């Protein structure tokens, strides 16, 4: 009875009143104090007076500004970035940006422009990036650009422009990007291209224009960083038209909704009279490939043949011996040996990702690629009972291997012995079966990144990660520890150089306070989406300055003794936890408000208890934890009763003692 009465009095003693201060007013979000503001989609028809004059970056898209003039932004003289996407702008009057001398980037995307004054852009002296995408213009002459000598990129996609000819006096000396994708350009003349002569290493995007003709000599001696003719059906026109040009990257891919046309070897003859380092031919149809199909590709460094319906490459291909990077993704190979790897002795990067048929790795199919550094075989339905030394024979210089999203792989001891130089190994979403007690990774002394997420790996073995002295990043997301606990002795203890540890979605319920003691270099720990309570925070007491993600756990009350551990971290995420917002958690709530700069996703860090404050942001809660009147009353009653009982007890004791003298 006595304990029950005591509890009752203690509850009454600490009855508290709670209140939440919230604001429902829509206003711009401050991203950087006095400098960067987001006012998107607020239905505004003018610049809010609350924005300081010191504003430098303003995101103002999805508002309503039918007309802008010289008074619209006049006081924001420090603007360097202005986004006016979909603001229903029709008219841009004289000297609209006359006060914005420092304006660097102007975005006018998706505004139905009718009029733009000749002096509309006369103010900015350092304008570098202009976006006129989907504005309905039919000619570049619509934009007054004659004074923009600092312009580096101009985006004009999704309009009705039929010629790329730039206006007379258009400054191109510093122009690096000119984007005309999805317009109505079908012919390129010498006159068109002559207006680009002053631009060096330009990236010209004509994707989605279906070029039907190029005047002979239009690209003579031209030098481009990149050219994009994506969606053009007649590749013969392109290769003939680019004669005598020099191009770093040439993009000639097509789209899925276009009719497949066979590419004959004659199409590529024009390549013999131009210089190209990288070509993308994705989604074209190669019906028959002979040994001479690529004979004009002799200087090529990179070739992308994604989704080109290939099921086999013949041996003895001419012209690809110097190729460094080859992409054969989304094709129809059944066995890795069908790519005839001996055709590419200089290859350093190979990607066969998302093969449309189950890919058999075979034995030694890539052994001629002794210079290979990166290999991507993800999403290929690969399955093998003995991975991976026979399959990766002679790849001693391989540094990156991606086998993610495949079928079950069985790993023996030193499963990657043929690849001792590996620095990155990705086995995510591939079920792994470790056959031996010893680690399958133990010879990978240079491995820095290991992704084992959702691999259904048995993590109970303490030797699982032996032999990985250089490992810095380990992702174990979606794997389960025995009984949902990480014990003092565990498989992670040998990873002394680990910096990033991901243990999200691991169904963890507890972590021993000494589980991570040997992991002294960690700076990023993700424990989100588990069943952890605040007691597991003790396991991080030896770490300082880390990013700590505790989102979506079962943390309710954080005791005062744990607050110093949180205080010494760089960034903390506590969103979607059932946080207690009563006086029982008052010390944490006070700490939370004092350390907002450390906290991430504060908009989703909400109270769960008491019901009155459920769904309220912690930052908006103010508790008054002083003793309530009813508490004082019960305290007085309790003290009076206690005093009376004490008096009677003393009196009884003295009487008993007197009687027994």
Swiss-Prot record:
Keywords: Cell membrane, Glycoprotein, Immunity, Inflammatory response, Innate immunity, Leucine-rich repeat, Membrane, Receptor, Repeat, Signal, Transmembrane, Transmembrane helix. Disulfide bonds: none annotated. GO terms for cellular component: mitotic spindle; nucleolus; nucleoplasm; plasma membrane. Residues 577-627 form the LRRCT domain. The keyword Ribosomal protein does not apply. LRR repeats lie at residues 54-75, 78-99, 102-123, 126-147, 150-171, 174-195, 201-221, 275-296, 299-321, 322-343, 346-366, 371-391, 397-418, 421-442, 446-466, 470-493, 497-518, 521-544, 546-566. Residues 651-661 are cytoplasmic. Its main location: membrane. The chain crosses the membrane at residues 627-650. It holds the Pfam family LRR_11. Glycans are attached at residues 34, 53, 70, 78, 201, 244, 288, 394, 402, 451. M-shaped tetramer of two CD180-LY86 heterodimers. May cooperate with MD-1 and TLR4 to mediate the innate immune response to bacterial lipopolysaccharide (LPS) in B-cells. Leads to NF-kappa-B activation. Also involved in the life/death decision of B-cells. This is CD180 antigen. It comes from Mus musculus. The lineage of its organism: Eukaryota, Metazoa, Chordata, Craniata, Vertebrata. The gene is Cd180.
């Amino acid at each position: 009875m006595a304990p029950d009465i005591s509890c009752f009095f203690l509850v009454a003693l600490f009855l508290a009143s709670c209140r939440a201060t919230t604001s429902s007013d829509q206003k711009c979000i401050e991203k950087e104090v006095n400098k960067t503001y987001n006012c998107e989609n607020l239905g505004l028809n003018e610049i809010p007076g609350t924005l300081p004059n010191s504003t430098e970056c303003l995101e103002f898209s999805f508002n309503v500004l039918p007309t802008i003039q010289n008074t619209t932004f006049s006081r924001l003289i420090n603007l360097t970035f202005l986004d006016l996407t979909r603001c229903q702008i029709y008219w841009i009057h004289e000297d609209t940006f006359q006060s914005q001398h420092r304006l660097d980037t102007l975005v006018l995307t998706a505004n139905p422009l009718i009029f733009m004054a000749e002096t509309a852009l006369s103010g900015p002296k350092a304008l570098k990036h202009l976006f006129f995408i989907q504005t309905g213009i039919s000619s570049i002459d619509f934009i007054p650009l004659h004074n923009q000598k600092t312009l580096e990129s101009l985006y004009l996609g999704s309009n009705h422009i039929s010629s790329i000819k730039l206006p007379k006096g258009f400054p191109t000396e510093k122009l690096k990007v000119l984007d005309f994708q999805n317009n109505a350009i079908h012919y390129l003349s010498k006159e068109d291209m002559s207006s680009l002569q002053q631009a060096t290493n330009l990236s010209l995007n004509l994707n989605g224009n279906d070029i039907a003709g190029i005047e002979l000599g239009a690209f003579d001696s031209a030098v481009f960083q990149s050219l994009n003719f994506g969606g053009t059906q007649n590749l013969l026109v392109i290769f003939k038209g680019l004669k005598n040009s020099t191009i770093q990257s040439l993009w000639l891919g097509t789209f899925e909704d276009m009719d497949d046309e066979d590419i004959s070897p004659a199409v590529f003859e024009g390549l013999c009279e131009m210089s190209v380092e990288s070509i993308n031919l994705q989604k074209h149809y190669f019906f028959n490939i002979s040994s001479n199909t690529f004979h004009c590709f002799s200087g090529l460094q990179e070739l992308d043949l994604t989704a080109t319906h290939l099921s086999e490459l013949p041996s003895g291909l001419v012209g690809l011996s110097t190729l460094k990077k080859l992409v054969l993704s989304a094709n129809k190979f059944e066995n890795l040996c069908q790519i005839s790897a001996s055709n590419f002795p200089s290859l350093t990067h190979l990607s066969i990702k998302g093969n449309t048929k189950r890919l058999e790795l075979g034995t030694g199919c890539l052994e001629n690629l002794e210079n290979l550094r990166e290999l991507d075989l993800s999403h290929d339905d690969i399955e093998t009972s003995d991975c991976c030394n026979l399959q990766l024979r002679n790849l001693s210089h391989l540094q990156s291997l991606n086998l993610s999203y495949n079928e079950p792989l069985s790993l023996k001891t030193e499963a990657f012995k043929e690849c001792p130089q590996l620095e990155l190994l990705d086995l995510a979403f591939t079920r792994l079966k470790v056959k031996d007690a010893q680690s399958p990774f133990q010879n990978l002394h240079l491995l820095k990144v290991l992704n084992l997420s959702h691999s259904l790996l048995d993590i109970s073995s303490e030797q699982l990660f032996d032999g990985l002295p250089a490992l810095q990043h380990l992702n174990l997301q979606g794997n389960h520890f025995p009984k949902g606990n990480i014990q003092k002795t565990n498989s992670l203890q040998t990873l002394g150089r680990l910096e990033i540890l991901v243990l999200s979605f691991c169904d963890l319920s507890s972590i021993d306070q000494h589980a991570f003691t040997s992991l002294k270099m960690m700076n990023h720990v993700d424990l989100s989406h588990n069943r952890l309570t605040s007691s597991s925070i003790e396991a991080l007491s030896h770490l300082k300055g880390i990013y700590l993600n505790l989102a979506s756990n079962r943390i309710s009350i954080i005791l005062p003794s744990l607050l110093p551990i949180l205080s010494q971290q760089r960034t903390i995420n506590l969103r979607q936890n059932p946080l207690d917002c009563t006086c029982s958690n008052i010390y944490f709530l006070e700490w939370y408000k004092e350390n907002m700069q450390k906290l991430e996703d504060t908009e989703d860090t909400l109270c769960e208890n008491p019901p009155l404050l459920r769904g309220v942001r912690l930052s908006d809660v103010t508790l008054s934890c002083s003793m309530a009147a009813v508490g004082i009353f019960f305290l007085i009653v309790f003290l009076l009763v206690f005093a009376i009982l004490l008096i009677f007890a003393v009196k009884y004791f003295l009487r008993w003692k007197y009687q027994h003298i």
